[in-house]
Amino acid sequence: MARTTPIERYRNIGISAHIDAGKTTTTERILFYTGVSHKIGEVHDGAATMDWMEQEQERGITITSAATTAFWSGMSQQFPQHRINVIDTPGHVDFTVEVERSMRVLDGAVMVYCAVGGVQPQSETVWRQANKYEVPRIAFVNKMDRTGANFLRVVEQLKTRLGANAIPLQLPVGAEENFTGVVDLIKMKAINWNEADQGMTFTYEEVPANMQADCEEWRQNLVEAAAEASEELMEKYLGGEDLTEEEIKSALRQRVLANEIILVTCGSAFKNKGVQAMLDAVVEYLPAPTDIPAIKGINPDETEGERHASDEEPFSSLAFKIATDPFVGNLTFFRVYSGVINSGDTVLNSVRQKRERFGRIVQMHANKREEIKEVRAGDIAAAIGLKDVTTGDTLCAIDAPIILERMEFPEPVISVAVEPKTKADQEKMGLALGRLAQEDPSFRVHTDEESGETIISGMGELHLDIIVDRMKREFKVEANIGKPQVSYRETIRTRVNDVEGKHAKQSGGRGQYGHVVIDLYPLDPEGPGYEFVNEIKGGVIPGEYIPAVDKGIQEQLKSGPLAGYPVVDLGVRLHFGSYHDVDSSELAFKLAASLAFKAAFSKANPVLLEPIMKVEVETPPEYVGDVIGDLSRRRAMVNGQEANEFVVKIDAEVPLSEMFGYATDLRSQTQGRASYSMEPLKYAEAPTSVAAAVIEARKK
């Protein structure tokens, strides 16, 4: 079957934003204008097509990024048909893993900002993730119809808060309730959308007289940015010649793709204005799969390989999301980087070295699906019924194996114990948690060896609330939840040398003998977390026992001597020891190493580390005193404040253990008018009194 849309006309984009910037509404309008959904779903009444899990509809926030395929030929049908795969990414900080994962599979992104709230804390997190994956992006300033909307203020914040080279592509005509449309600065025409047909049709009009001077100035700014794309254009521009519309657009596209500029559009998705022109900008300025560098991977022989966006190359794809569908079981969303795959084909999961058969392949529209026979380079689709695939796995041609980089997921910072209410719940709970952990790598499940309790860990209170909620709804498991526990860490502050560990047992017949001498030293927190250096000279310990020493120490790292928390940021140097021809064994050296480690750890000034969160509170000015006072009681370090006439943004670093229940307290202090976001920042040494209390509590 031949390709229906040339790959140059694909756009794989993410729509990314802070909570409540109106991202889901924006995505809904995209689906509406591209003709996919006929009734616009409103988030206010919990009926948006993209938010397909029940909790999302209740909480009005987006949790799972659904991938949707839509088609667009331009506002005035000026382009051949383009295929836009929209990946809806969550805006809540507890779900940053989902955002990271979708960033991997996007080629470009639309960053949605609220014209009133501007660049909010979460926007910065998402921005940094987009930088990390070098995703070209454009901005859409939404909610231009709201009181307090100010387009140019948001453009300014993009520059000052995100360091973006933000360049308006449009200016709004009017603002707040007088917002009527936008001026296209390249054409120098005002665009007026027809309210009667929900913005499906529009007219070009002259630029309002009172805006002429401003528009000229901003157009100059835009043309200058285009001219900077090449010396040739710069000469033409400086020589006083006009650049053609075509020259301006292709130069701007080149600079967006190189991540040198961010073009800014605006509108009000809710009022059906501006999304249509933003879609045109997606087609004109964001990359096709062929515009981005080949994806890198690792060949079976550990050399670096790559795959280009071409149907001719061997098949390679990345599984970026696994969702459980009530009707068909597991849906594995995957992005094809190269080659072609047909339903019924068998591929290799190169990470697990297992074969998988692609039974049915579907393309999703929010939560409706359409079966398709094949997918090609650049496509995003979902496979039904793959057996053993986890997010981040590579699915590729059996005869051309490659591992596309594994994604690294952050370590969870918060844990709670869950206990099934009945015996029947117990069996179902194991299954449910296993399923949920497979979908979400930032969520972990383990059994506490001492208490036998099931412990779940995640990225924040909201994250775990939602996991428990899904367990109840999707798997019908009733469970009691314990108090949230903080994931502390242990480390050392000073170096100790020549610490001995000897394991010798002589009990008739063959004995056990292992003897090691190690140094223990602190490592930089930014470093690898653990290193093992073997400096045994002259075979005082035979080579085959060295890995056992390393293993013995690594087993101790899982549960540290202070309070049983994981041990981080230390190095071990093994430099002396002895062995016995008959009695030595791997086990004996493992035990000797663990004895040496415990002895060395207690001498090396061990300390407890606690997770510190980066907390940003936005509050009306009248509550600043109360909010800061309360943060100080929580051992916060307030780093600064930033104010405009509506809100004060407070930047602080607060230990996670002090943040439980903060949402409720903040609501009552500010009558529900403040909001906050937090994300893991670093681990820092816990004060002596806190450490003592934690260690004491662990002994009970």
UniProtKB/Swiss-Prot annotation:
InterPro entries, A to Z: EFG_II, EFG_III, EFG_III/V, EFG_IV, EFG_V, EFG_V-like, EFTu-like_2, G_TR_CS
Keyword Magnesium recorded: no
tRNA processing among keywords: no
Listed GO biological process terms: ribosome disassembly
Keyword terms of this UniProt record: Cytoplasm, Elongation factor, GTP-binding, Nucleotide-binding, Protein biosynthesis
One of the record's GO molecular function terms: GTPase activity
Entries under PROSITE patterns matching the protein: G_TR_1, G_TR_2
GO cellular component, one term: cytoplasm
Binding site for GTP: 17-24, 88-92, 142-145
Domain tr-type G residues, every copy: 8-290
Main location: cytoplasm
Residues making up the signal peptide according to the UniProt record: none
NCBIfam families: EF-G, PRK12740.1-5, small_GTP
Family annotation (HAMAP family): EF_G_EF_2_B
Family from the record: Belongs to the TRAFAC class translation factor GTPase superfamily. Classic translation factor GTPase family. EF-G/EF-2 subfamily.
UniProt protein name: Elongation factor G
